[in-house]
Protein backbone atom coordinates (compact mmCIF):
# COMPACT_ATOMS: atom_id res chain seq x y z
CA UNK A 1 0.00 0.00 0.00
CA UNK A 2 1.34 3.43 -0.90
CA UNK A 3 1.64 6.40 1.43
CA UNK A 4 -1.24 8.08 -0.37
CA UNK A 5 -3.45 5.00 -0.09
CA UNK A 6 -2.65 4.74 3.61
CA UNK A 7 -3.66 8.37 4.11
CA UNK A 8 -7.05 7.95 2.50
CA UNK A 9 -10.13 7.27 4.59
CA UNK A 10 -10.59 3.51 4.70
CA UNK A 11 -13.97 3.50 6.43
CA UNK A 12 -15.50 6.95 6.63
CA UNK A 13 -18.77 5.59 7.97
CA UNK A 14 -17.29 3.71 10.94
CA UNK A 15 -18.37 5.36 14.21
CA UNK A 16 -15.69 7.03 16.29
CA UNK A 17 -13.04 6.99 13.55
CA UNK A 18 -11.27 10.20 12.59
CA UNK A 19 -11.18 10.82 8.88
CA UNK A 20 -7.59 10.88 7.68
CA UNK A 21 -6.53 13.46 5.15
CA UNK A 22 -5.08 12.56 1.77
CA UNK A 23 -1.40 13.40 1.51
CA UNK A 24 -0.40 16.18 -0.86
CA UNK A 25 3.17 16.43 -2.12
CA UNK A 26 5.64 19.27 -2.00
CA UNK A 27 7.59 18.15 -5.05
CA UNK A 28 11.16 19.11 -5.95
CA UNK A 29 12.34 18.22 -9.46
CA UNK A 30 16.06 18.65 -10.20
CA UNK A 31 17.03 18.78 -13.90
CA UNK A 32 20.60 17.47 -13.57
CA UNK A 33 21.73 17.75 -17.23
CA UNK A 34 20.53 21.35 -17.50
CA UNK A 35 21.94 22.52 -14.17
CA UNK A 36 25.26 20.76 -14.73
CA UNK A 37 25.61 22.71 -17.96
CA UNK A 38 24.67 25.99 -16.27
CA UNK A 39 27.07 25.47 -13.39
CA UNK A 40 29.83 24.55 -15.82
CA UNK A 41 29.32 27.79 -17.74
CA UNK A 42 29.63 29.82 -14.52
CA UNK A 43 32.77 27.96 -13.44
CA UNK A 44 34.31 27.71 -16.89
CA UNK A 45 34.77 23.97 -16.47
CA UNK A 46 33.86 20.99 -14.33
CA UNK A 47 33.03 21.84 -10.71
CA UNK A 48 35.39 20.97 -7.88
CA UNK A 49 34.09 19.55 -4.60
CA UNK A 50 33.75 23.09 -3.22
CA UNK A 51 31.42 24.09 -6.04
CA UNK A 52 29.26 20.98 -6.34
CA UNK A 53 25.71 21.37 -4.98
CA UNK A 54 25.17 19.80 -1.58
CA UNK A 55 21.95 17.84 -1.82
CA UNK A 56 21.76 17.29 1.93
CA UNK A 57 21.49 21.07 2.35
CA UNK A 58 18.90 21.22 -0.43
CA UNK A 59 16.93 18.45 1.28
CA UNK A 60 16.92 20.35 4.58
CA UNK A 61 15.70 23.44 2.76
CA UNK A 62 12.88 21.40 1.18
CA UNK A 63 11.89 20.07 4.61
CA UNK A 64 11.80 23.62 6.00
CA UNK A 65 9.76 24.77 3.02
CA UNK A 66 7.28 21.96 3.59
CA UNK A 67 7.01 22.85 7.27
CA UNK A 68 6.27 26.49 6.36
CA UNK A 69 3.46 25.41 4.04
CA UNK A 70 2.07 23.02 6.63
CA UNK A 71 2.04 25.80 9.24
CA UNK A 72 -0.18 27.86 6.94
CA UNK A 73 -2.75 25.05 6.90
CA UNK A 74 -2.46 22.90 10.05
CA UNK A 75 -5.13 20.50 8.81
CA UNK A 76 -3.21 19.69 5.62
CA UNK A 77 -1.18 16.48 5.31
CA UNK A 78 1.94 17.46 3.36
CA UNK A 79 4.84 15.26 2.37
CA UNK A 80 8.08 16.44 0.70
CA UNK A 81 9.38 14.51 -2.30
CA UNK A 82 12.86 15.18 -3.68
CA UNK A 83 13.70 13.88 -7.16
CA UNK A 84 16.67 14.12 -9.50
CA UNK A 85 16.39 13.36 -13.22
CA UNK A 86 19.59 12.54 -15.09
CA UNK A 87 20.98 10.93 -18.22
CA UNK A 88 23.62 8.21 -18.13
CA UNK A 89 25.99 8.40 -21.10
CA UNK A 90 27.38 5.13 -22.50
CA UNK A 91 30.35 3.95 -20.46
CA UNK A 92 29.78 6.41 -17.59
CA UNK A 93 27.79 4.20 -15.20
CA UNK A 94 30.69 3.48 -12.84
CA UNK A 95 31.68 7.15 -12.73
CA UNK A 96 28.13 8.31 -11.97
CA UNK A 97 27.23 5.49 -9.56
CA UNK A 98 28.74 7.08 -6.38
CA UNK A 99 26.86 10.32 -7.05
CA UNK A 100 23.56 8.50 -7.59
CA UNK A 101 24.05 6.42 -4.44
CA UNK A 102 24.90 9.55 -2.43
CA UNK A 103 21.66 11.18 -3.61
CA UNK A 104 19.61 8.15 -2.64
CA UNK A 105 21.35 8.05 0.73
CA UNK A 106 20.05 11.54 1.61
CA UNK A 107 16.48 10.82 0.57
CA UNK A 108 16.40 11.78 -3.12
CA UNK A 109 14.76 9.51 -5.68
CA UNK A 110 16.77 9.35 -8.91
CA UNK A 111 15.29 8.82 -12.37
CA UNK A 112 18.17 7.71 -14.60
CA UNK A 113 17.83 7.31 -18.37
CA UNK A 114 20.40 6.13 -20.92
CA UNK A 115 21.68 8.91 -23.16
CA UNK A 116 21.67 7.23 -26.55
CA UNK A 117 20.84 10.18 -28.81
CA UNK A 118 19.68 13.80 -28.76
CA UNK A 119 16.07 12.74 -28.26
CA UNK A 120 16.74 10.75 -25.09
CA UNK A 121 16.75 13.69 -22.69
CA UNK A 122 14.63 13.65 -19.53
CA UNK A 123 12.36 16.67 -20.16
CA UNK A 124 9.29 14.59 -20.98
CA UNK A 125 9.93 12.32 -17.99
CA UNK A 126 10.07 15.27 -15.59
CA UNK A 127 6.84 16.72 -16.97
CA UNK A 128 5.14 13.32 -16.79
CA UNK A 129 6.11 12.93 -13.13
CA UNK A 130 4.85 16.43 -12.35
CA UNK A 131 1.53 15.60 -14.04
CA UNK A 132 1.26 12.36 -12.05
CA UNK A 133 1.82 14.09 -8.72
CA UNK A 134 -0.59 16.85 -9.69
CA UNK A 135 -3.31 14.26 -10.31
CA UNK A 136 -2.58 12.61 -6.95
CA UNK A 137 -2.42 15.86 -5.00
CA UNK A 138 0.20 18.59 -5.23
CA UNK A 139 0.65 21.24 -2.53
CA UNK A 140 3.63 23.00 -4.11
CA UNK A 141 6.08 22.49 -6.96
CA UNK A 142 9.75 23.43 -7.10
CA UNK A 143 11.64 22.88 -10.35
CA UNK A 144 15.41 23.32 -10.52
CA UNK A 145 16.10 24.05 -14.19
CA UNK A 146 16.90 26.89 -16.56
CA UNK A 147 15.02 25.26 -19.43
CA UNK A 148 12.30 27.80 -20.09
CA UNK A 149 11.41 26.23 -23.41
CA UNK A 150 10.38 23.00 -21.70
CA UNK A 151 9.02 24.35 -18.43
CA UNK A 152 7.68 27.89 -18.66
CA UNK A 153 4.24 27.18 -20.12
CA UNK A 154 3.40 24.06 -18.04
CA UNK A 155 4.68 25.65 -14.83
CA UNK A 156 2.69 28.83 -15.37
CA UNK A 157 -0.41 26.73 -16.08
CA UNK A 158 0.06 24.94 -12.75
CA UNK A 159 0.65 28.22 -10.93
CA UNK A 160 -2.54 29.69 -12.40
CA UNK A 161 -4.46 26.74 -10.97
CA UNK A 162 -3.54 27.91 -7.48
CA UNK A 163 -0.55 25.66 -6.74
CA UNK A 164 2.57 27.61 -5.66
CA UNK A 165 5.38 27.06 -8.18
CA UNK A 166 9.02 28.02 -7.70
CA UNK A 167 11.92 27.85 -10.13
CA UNK A 168 15.37 27.16 -8.69
CA UNK A 169 18.51 27.98 -10.63
CA UNK A 170 21.04 30.67 -11.48
CA UNK A 171 19.60 34.08 -12.25
CA UNK A 172 22.06 34.55 -15.13
CA UNK A 173 20.27 31.75 -16.99
CA UNK A 174 16.69 32.20 -15.76
CA UNK A 175 15.35 35.42 -17.24
CA UNK A 176 12.16 33.56 -18.25
CA UNK A 177 11.40 32.74 -14.62
CA UNK A 178 12.35 36.18 -13.34
CA UNK A 179 10.04 37.75 -15.91
CA UNK A 180 7.07 35.59 -14.98
CA UNK A 181 4.27 37.09 -12.91
CA UNK A 182 3.16 33.68 -11.64
CA UNK A 183 6.44 31.93 -10.81
CA UNK A 184 8.70 32.51 -7.82
CA UNK A 185 12.44 32.40 -8.52
CA UNK A 186 15.00 31.16 -5.99
CA UNK A 187 18.69 31.47 -6.78
CA UNK A 188 20.46 28.28 -5.74
CA UNK A 189 23.25 30.25 -4.12
CA UNK A 190 20.69 31.91 -1.83
CA UNK A 191 19.79 28.53 -0.29
CA UNK A 192 21.91 28.08 2.85
CA UNK A 193 24.94 25.78 2.51
CA UNK A 194 24.08 24.41 -0.94
CA UNK A 195 27.56 25.48 -2.01
CA UNK A 196 30.57 25.20 0.28
CA UNK A 197 32.20 28.26 -1.28
CA UNK A 198 30.80 31.24 -3.22
CA UNK A 199 30.56 30.65 -6.95
CA UNK A 200 32.86 32.81 -9.11
CA UNK A 201 29.98 34.79 -10.57
CA UNK A 202 30.82 38.09 -12.23
CA UNK A 203 29.83 41.14 -10.21
CA UNK A 204 30.98 44.71 -9.76
CA UNK A 205 33.46 43.62 -7.10
CA UNK A 206 34.91 40.76 -9.17
CA UNK A 207 35.35 42.17 -12.67
CA UNK A 208 38.12 40.83 -14.91
CA UNK A 209 40.65 43.36 -16.21
CA UNK A 210 39.20 43.17 -19.71
CA UNK A 211 35.69 43.93 -18.39
CA UNK A 212 32.57 41.80 -18.65
CA UNK A 213 28.93 41.97 -19.61
CA UNK A 214 26.41 41.93 -16.76
CA UNK A 215 23.26 40.34 -18.10
CA UNK A 216 19.84 41.85 -17.24
CA UNK A 217 17.81 40.25 -14.49
CA UNK A 218 14.69 40.54 -16.65
CA UNK A 219 14.19 40.80 -20.41
CA UNK A 220 13.41 44.26 -21.79
CA UNK A 221 10.00 42.99 -22.89
CA UNK A 222 8.96 42.68 -19.23
CA UNK A 223 8.50 46.47 -19.22
CA UNK A 224 5.44 46.01 -21.41
CA UNK A 225 3.62 44.14 -18.65
CA UNK A 226 4.82 46.25 -15.70
CA UNK A 227 3.22 49.37 -14.37
CA UNK A 228 4.91 52.73 -15.08
Describe each PLM feature range.
Residues 2-120:
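Domain-level signal for Mg2+-assisted phosphodiester chemistry and nucleotide/NA-binding surfaces
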Residues 92-227:
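Nuclease catalytic cores that cleave nucleic-acid phosphodiester bonds
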